[in-house]
C-alpha cells in the first residue's frame, strides 16, 4: 500500500501537514526541524496516514511518515522516538540514555497487528486485581545496622528487616532469598546469621528463596571460566593416568581450550582443597561488567552446582517441615547461561531478577519498562517487575532515601494503562540506614492503601512462565480454548468495553472485570483447558466474580448458589456480580471445620460485597472452602 520515492536529506523548508493526536506526540513532540526521511506515498485507500510532511504549500510533495494499514505499518526512521547517549560522567542513577516516544507504541502496534480481537495472556492481574508480590535479596544480611533505635544493640540489618518490614506485615507476603555464604559457618556465617534466617523463613507469609551461594557478580565471565576449567581439569586428571593422553591429545586440547600452564592447573586444584587460597578461586581481572570482582565471596572456586543446587539444599536445611525453597533470585549482572537456567529447573524452582523497570522523572518513558524476561536457550529468565533500591541510591552509596520514589513507577505503570504488577523488591541492606528503612516502610504503607491481590514471588514467576508457554486455540467465532498456561489465570481483551463473557458457552471461567477499556477474564486454576466465549455485553445469567483480594479456584455453580476455594493474605475482600438486592448466606470452612457464617445483600447494582476476614498468619497457605447460598426474604 506504499510507494517509496526520493530520500529527503534537508528538511528546513518542510513542515508537518497531517498529524493524528492519538498516534503522535505521545511522550515528546517532534523537533521544529524535521529529521531527514525517505519520501513515501500511499497507493492504497485502506492505508491510514497518521503523520505526513510536505514542502511549503506544494501538496504534490506530501510524504507519509507514519502509516498503518491492513497489511502492517510503517514509521519513518527518526520519527518513532527521541534518544541521546548518556554523558561520560553519568552516575548509576542517571547513566542511561534519554529516551522518549514520539509515536504511541501501544496504538501503533495495536493497528499494525490488528490485535483488538486477540486474547492476550495477562501477567499484571489476578482475580480482577493488580498483582502484588515482594522479594528480598540477601545482600547485607550481616551488616551491622546504623538505624537509630537499634544502633546500640549491634543488631544485623537482616534482623532489623525482620522486625520492621516482615513481622508487622503478615498481610503482604514476601519471598526472602539469603546468600548461603552469609549463613554457612564454613563460609562467613555464624550462629546469629543462622538464627535470624530460621526466624525469618519460619514465618508462614515468608516464602523461601535462594540468592545463590557466593553471590556471583559477573555471570558471563564465570560461565566462560567454568567451561574452560572443566576442559582443563579433564586434561589434568587423565594425563596423570595415561602418558599417551598427554603425548597425543594434549596439544589438541591446548589448541581448542587455550589451557593454562601445568603450574596454574595444580594451583587451581589446590585452591579447591584450601579455602584460604582465595587468589586462586577465579581468574584475575580488575573490572568485570561494572563490578570490581567476579563474586562477592571468593572463598572457594566457582561451582555452578553449588551456586544453585547447593545453596537451595543448604537453605532447605533451615526450613520448618513441609517448607522448601521455591525461587532462585539471580545476583549481579543477572545475565545467566542456559546451564544456570537449567540448574534451576533441575532443582525444581522458579527464577527471577533482572529488568530494573523505572518510570519516573529520571526515567520518564515507557522505554524503561522492561519486558517480562529474556530467552536463554530453551529457558526463560523472569525479570522482576520493578527496580530495587540500588538504582535509586547509586548502588547504595548516596540518596539512601531514594527508594521511596518507587511509588512514582508504581503509579505510572498502573495508569493510564496497567502494564506491570506491584513489585516491592529490595535488599537486606535497607535495614542498615534510617532513610533506607523508612523508604521501604513508605512503600509498604502505599501497598496497603491499594486494591491488590498479593501472591508470592514464585507464583508471579509461574504466571510469567505461563505467558511464555500458553497456547490459545480459536475454536469458534469469539471462542477460544487456553492450553498449557502454567500459573497464568488471566486473559485480557483490549478495546472490549462493549463485550462480555458468554457464560453459557464458556468453561472454567470464574469472573470478569472491565478496567481501562479492557476486559479481564479470570480463569479457574483447577481447570486444565478453560474455554472463553465472548458476546455483546448484556446482563449475565449466572453470578460471577468481579474482583477479590484472595485468588480463588474450584468454582462450582450449585442451584441458587456456588462454592469455591480461596487462599490469600490479609482481609479476604470480594465483590460478586449477582441479581439486584439478592440476599446471600456465606459460609466459610477450613477443611471440615466451620469457621464463619455471615449474611450479605447485593446492592441495587447487583454487586455483592463481603469479607471472609483476616486469616490467622499460621494458616496463610491453607485454602478455605466458601459457599454462597442465595436465600429468600426481603433485605
Short names for language-model regions:
Residues 95-219, 233-242, 246, 301, ...:
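Active-site beta->alpha N-cap acidic-glycine motif
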Residues 188-189, 299-378, 437, 606-613, ...:
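Catalytic domains of cell-wall/extracellular-matrix polysaccharide-remodeling enzymes
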Residues 59-73, 123, 410-414:
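Short, surface-exposed beta-strand/loop micro-motifs that present aromatic residues
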Residues 68-177, 434-465, 531-562, 567-568, ...:
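Extracellular ligand-binding/catalytic regions of CAZymes and related secreted enzymes
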Residues 108-128, 160-179, 184, 205, ...:
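C-terminal domain-boundary segment and adjacent tail
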Residues 454-635:
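Non-catalytic C-terminal accessory domains or segments of carbohydrate-active enzymes
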Residues 1-59, 487-489, 495-497:
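An acidic, glycine-rich "communication" segment
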Residues 216-320, 372-414:
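Alpha-helical scaffold elements lining the catalytic groove of polysaccharide deacetylases
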Amino acid at each position: 500500500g506504499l510507494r517509496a520515492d526520493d530520500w529527503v536529506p534537508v528538511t528546513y523548508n518542510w513542515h508537518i501537514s497531517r498529524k493524528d493526536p492519538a498516534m503522535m506526540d505521545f511522550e515528546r513532540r517532534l523537533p521544529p526541524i524535521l529529521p531527514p526521511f525517505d519520501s513515501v506515498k500511499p497507493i492504497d485507500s485502506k492505508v491510514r496516514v497518521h503523520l505526513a510532511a510536505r514542502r511549503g504549500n506544494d501538496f504534490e510533495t506530501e510524504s507519509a511518515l507514519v502509516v498503518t494499514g491492513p497489511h502492517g505499518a510503517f514509521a519513518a526512521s527518526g520519527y518513532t522516538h527521541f534518544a541521546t547517549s548518556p554523558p561520560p560522567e553519568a552516575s548509576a542513577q542517571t547513566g542511561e540514555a534519554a529516551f522518549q516516544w514520539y509515536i504511541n507504541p501501544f496504538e501503533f502496534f495495536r493497528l499494525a497487528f490488528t490485535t483488538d480481537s486477540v486474547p492476550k495472556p495477562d501477567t499484571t492481574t489476578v482475580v480482577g486485581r493488580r498483582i502484588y508480590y515482594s522479594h528480598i535479596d540477601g545482600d547485607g544480611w550481616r551488616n551491622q545496622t546504623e538505624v537509630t533505635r537499634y544502633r546500640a544493640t549491634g543488631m544485623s540489618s537482616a534482623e532489623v528487616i525482620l522486625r520492621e518490614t516482615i513481622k508487622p506485615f503478615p498481610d503482604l507476603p514476601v519471598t526472602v532469598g539469603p546468600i548461603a555464604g552469609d549463613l554457612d559457618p564454613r563460609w562467613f556465617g555464624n550462629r546469629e546469621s543462622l538464627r535470624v534466617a530460621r526466624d525469618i523463613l519460619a514465618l508462614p507469609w515468608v516464602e523461601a528463596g535462594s540468592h545463590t551461594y557466593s553471590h556471583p557478580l559477573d555471570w558471563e565471565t564465570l560461565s566462560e571460566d567454568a567451561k574452560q576449567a572443566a576442559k582443563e581439569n579433564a586434561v589434568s586428571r587423565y594425563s596423570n593416568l595415561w602418558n599417551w593422553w598427554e603425548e597425543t591429545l594434549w596439544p589438541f586440547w591446548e589448541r581448542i581450550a587455550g589451557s593454562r600452564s601445568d603450574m596454574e592447573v595444580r594451583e587451581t586444584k589446590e585452591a579447591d582443597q584450601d579455602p584460604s587460597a582465595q587468589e586462586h578461586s577465579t581468574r584475575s581481572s580488575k573490572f568485570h561488567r561494572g563490578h570490581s570482582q567476579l563474586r562477592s565471596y571468593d572463598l572457594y572456586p566457582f561451582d555452578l552446582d553449588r551456586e544453585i543446587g547447593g545453596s537451595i539444599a543448604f537453605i532447605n536445611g533451615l526450613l520448618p517441615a513441609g517448607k522448601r525453597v521455591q525461587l532462585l533470585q539471580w545476583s549481579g549482572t543477572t545475565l545467566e547461561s542456559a546451564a544456570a537456567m537449567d540448574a534451576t529447573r533441575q532443582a525444581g524452582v522458579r527464577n527471577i531478577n533482572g529488568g530494573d523497570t523505572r518510570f519516573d522523572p529520571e526515567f520518564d518513558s515507557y522505554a524503561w519498562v522492561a519486558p517480562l524476561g529474556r530467552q536463554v536457550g530453551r529457558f526463560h529468565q523472569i525479570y522482576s517487575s520493578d527496580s530495587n533500591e540500588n538504582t535509586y541510591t547509586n548502588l547504595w552509596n548516596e540518596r539512601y532515601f531514594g527508594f521511596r520514589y518507587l511509588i512514582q513507577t508504581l503509579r505510572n505503570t498502573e495508569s493510564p494503562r496497567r502494564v506491570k504488577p506491584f513489585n516491592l523488591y529490595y535488599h537486606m541492606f535497607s535495614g542498615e540506614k534510617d532513610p533506607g528503612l523508612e523508604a521501604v516502610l513508605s512503600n509498604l504503607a502505599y501497598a496497603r492503601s491499594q486494591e491488590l491481590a498479593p501472591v508470592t514471588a514464585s507464583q508471579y514467576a509461574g504466571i510469567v512462565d505461563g505467558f511464555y508457554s500458553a497456547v490459545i486455540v480459536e475454536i469458534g467465532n469469539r471462542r477460544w480454548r487456553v492450553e498449557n498456561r502454567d500459573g497464568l489465570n488471566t486473559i485480557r481483551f483490549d478495546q472490549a468495553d462493549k463485550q462480555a463473557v458468554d457464560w453459557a458457552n464458556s468453561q472454567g471461567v470464574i469472573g470478569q472485570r472491565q478496567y481501562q477499556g479492557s476486559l479481564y477474564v479470570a480463569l479457574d486454576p483447577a481447570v486444565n483447558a478453560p474455554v472463553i466465549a465472548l458476546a455483546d455485553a448484556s446482563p449475565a445469567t449466572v453470578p460471577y466474580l468481579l474482583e477479590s483480594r484472595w485468588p480463588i479456584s474450584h468454582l462450582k455453580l450449585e442451584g441458587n448458589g456456588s462454592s469455591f476455594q480461596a487462599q490469600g493474605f490479609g482481609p479476604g475482600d470480594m465483590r460478586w456480580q449477582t441479581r439486584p438486592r439478592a440476599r446471600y448466606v456465606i459460609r466459610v470452612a477450613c477443611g471440615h471445620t466451620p469457621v464463619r457464617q455471615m449474611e450479605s445483600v447485593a446492592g441495587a447494582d447487583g454487586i455483592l460485597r463481603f469479607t471472609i476476614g483476616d486469616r490467622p498468619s499460621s494458616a496463610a497457605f491453607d485454602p478455605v472452602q466458601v459457599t454462597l447460598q442465595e436465600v429468600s426474604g426481603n433485605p
